[in-house]
Amino acid sequence: MGILIPAWVDDRLVPVDKLEAHEKGLKHKAVSVFAVRDMDILIQRRALGKYHTPGLWANTCCTHPDWDESASTCAVRRLREELGITGLYPEYRHRLEYHADVGNGMVENEVVDVFLAHVRGPLQVVPNPDEVMEIRWIGYHDLLAEVQRYPERFTPWLKIYLHHHADTIFGPDLIISAKA
């Protein structure tokens, strides 16, 4: 048995092996974080060793909480584990649900708590090569244009967040400023 995450089985929240949850398409909890500095968003390219969506661009970090872990604790933990980021305390923005085929017989059927972390000042980022192969800061408008032009380069959930939940995640200031 691998990592246990919170998933719904017969309308009950129970601990389920993470791989099993994806193979069976079980609805499960997830956490996504966006780090924003001025008008730029930190995105990551997933490591090639990931069991689904390897090599695709995603938001700053995304994961599943451990069975007994709160979403906010999970967000801080995964910023540290995936990107070596400490000292950021993401604020809760939104809960959303989505369902997406992520290839290799895997399905994301997630109830996601989304967090936004405002970066003020220098930020040391040290990607974990088992998780992340590349990072970059990109403006909101530029990210939308890239997703439109090369959708195959981005994870399904990032496209869903940008196309259907951006106002709630980022707020009007980032979106309006990015359009100007």
Swiss-Prot record:
<keyword id="KW-0414">Isoprene biosynthesis</keyword>
<feature type="binding site">
    <location>
        <position position="22"/>
    </location>
    <ligand>
        <name>Mn(2+)</name>
    </ligand>
</feature>
<keyword id="KW-0464">Manganese</keyword>
<dbReference type="GO" id="GO:0004452">
    <property type="term" value="F:isopentenyl-diphosphate delta-isomerase activity"/>
</dbReference>
<feature type="binding site">
    <location>
        <position position="64"/>
    </location>
    <ligand>
        <name>Mn(2+)</name>
    </ligand>
</feature>
<feature type="binding site">
    <location>
        <position position="110"/>
    </location>
    <ligand>
        <name>Mn(2+)</name>
    </ligand>
</feature>
<dbReference type="InterPro" id="IPR056375">
    <property type="entry name" value="Idi_bact"/>
</dbReference>
<feature type="domain" description="Nudix hydrolase">
    <location>
        <begin position="26"/>
        <end position="160"/>
    </location>
</feature>
<keyword id="KW-0479">Metal-binding</keyword>
<protein>
    <recommendedName>
        <fullName>Isopentenyl-diphosphate Delta-isomerase</fullName>
        <ecNumber>5.3.3.2</ecNumber>
    </recommendedName>
</protein>
<dbReference type="InterPro" id="IPR000086">
    <property type="entry name" value="NUDIX_hydrolase_dom"/>
</dbReference>
<feature type="active site">
    <location>
        <position position="62"/>
    </location>
</feature>
<keyword id="KW-0963">Cytoplasm</keyword>
<comment type="pathway">
    <text>Isoprenoid biosynthesis; dimethylallyl diphosphate biosynthesis; dimethylallyl diphosphate from isopentenyl diphosphate: step 1/1.</text>
</comment>
<feature type="binding site">
    <location>
        <position position="28"/>
    </location>
    <ligand>
        <name>Mn(2+)</name>
    </ligand>
</feature>
<dbReference type="InterPro" id="IPR011876">
    <property type="entry name" value="IsopentenylPP_isomerase_typ1"/>
</dbReference>
<dbReference type="GO" id="GO:0009240">
    <property type="term" value="P:isopentenyl diphosphate biosynthetic process"/>
</dbReference>
<keyword id="KW-0413">Isomerase</keyword>
<dbReference type="Pfam" id="PF00293">
    <property type="entry name" value="NUDIX"/>
</dbReference>
<feature type="binding site">
    <location>
        <position position="62"/>
    </location>
    <ligand>
        <name>Mg(2+)</name>
    </ligand>
</feature>
<keyword id="KW-0460">Magnesium</keyword>
<dbReference type="GO" id="GO:0050992">
    <property type="term" value="P:dimethylallyl diphosphate biosynthetic process"/>
</dbReference>
<feature type="active site">
    <location>
        <position position="110"/>
    </location>
</feature>
<feature type="binding site">
    <location>
        <position position="82"/>
    </location>
    <ligand>
        <name>Mg(2+)</name>
    </ligand>
</feature>
<dbReference type="GO" id="GO:0046872">
    <property type="term" value="F:metal ion binding"/>
</dbReference>
<comment type="similarity">
    <text>Belongs to the IPP isomerase type 1 family.</text>
</comment>
<feature type="binding site">
    <location>
        <position position="108"/>
    </location>
    <ligand>
        <name>Mn(2+)</name>
    </ligand>
</feature>
<dbReference type="GO" id="GO:0005737">
    <property type="term" value="C:cytoplasm"/>
</dbReference>
<comment type="function">
    <text>Catalyzes the 1,3-allylic rearrangement of the homoallylic substrate isopentenyl (IPP) to its highly electrophilic allylic isomer, dimethylallyl diphosphate (DMAPP).</text>
</comment>
<dbReference type="InterPro" id="IPR015797">
    <property type="entry name" value="NUDIX_hydrolase-like_dom_sf"/>
</dbReference>
